[in-house]
Amino acid sequence: MDNVDFYLEDLRSKFNKINIEKYYLSYSGGKDSHLLYWFIKEYATEFNKLQVVGINTYMEHPEIRERIYKNSNIVLLPTMKPFEIKEKYGIPCFSKEQDFYIYYYQKATREGKKPAKTYIDKINGTYKTGFSISKKAREYVLSGKAHKITHLCCHYLKKEPARKFEKENDLKPILGVRGNESSLRKKQYQACFTKDGKFTPLWDLTEELENAIYKKYNIEIPKVYNYVERTRLLRMPISVVISMIPKKNYLY
């Protein structure tokens, strides 16, 4: 048994720990979630009754969006559309963590209030321990020329519709996330289960091993991956992303 099959059998043992009637597969059409889709449909078919749920955020590459509709039992829609989020809250610009602090700093100043000390220190780079925003972000925000920046896009496009579905159906999600994708995710995902019961069986999967699984079993990879490494919502101003999306994509 090589490393690929050893990992897949270990993955099977992880799935055996859950009651599949209490979970659903959260399917984004990306490389990680599609690996889990392939796993339950082709490799460990004893789990193929798991419900597959996707979300059409209106922001996916067309190839990924078509994949979501093709492979999902249910496709959810956002609680707010991108244009609505842009109008009410602003647009993403830097990292999620930086956008979080910038959003609350800007919100307070727009309302004529003094931002909380933590937000001031994060923006000014005077926070004594831990994370502060980058020099580039700081200069832009303090210049007075910054547009409305927010971290809330993912919340309304993905998290809120998913949570509503989970509450209505009394289900927990199976997430295709890998802990070594970023330092933030490494902190968030350190075991198969999160504190709130989400199942994250790929938390310890390396990119090298994932690629080996795809190669050995000839798992379909969308053509868009020939040009980009990841297809999740882009970390660029959402107004730029929106301008790239044909209006016909909003008819789903």
Predicted regions and their residues:
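ATP-dependent adenylation/nucleotidyltransferase module used to activate substrates
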Residues: M1-K216
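Mid-to-C-terminal catalytic subdomains of enzymes
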Residues: W203-Y252
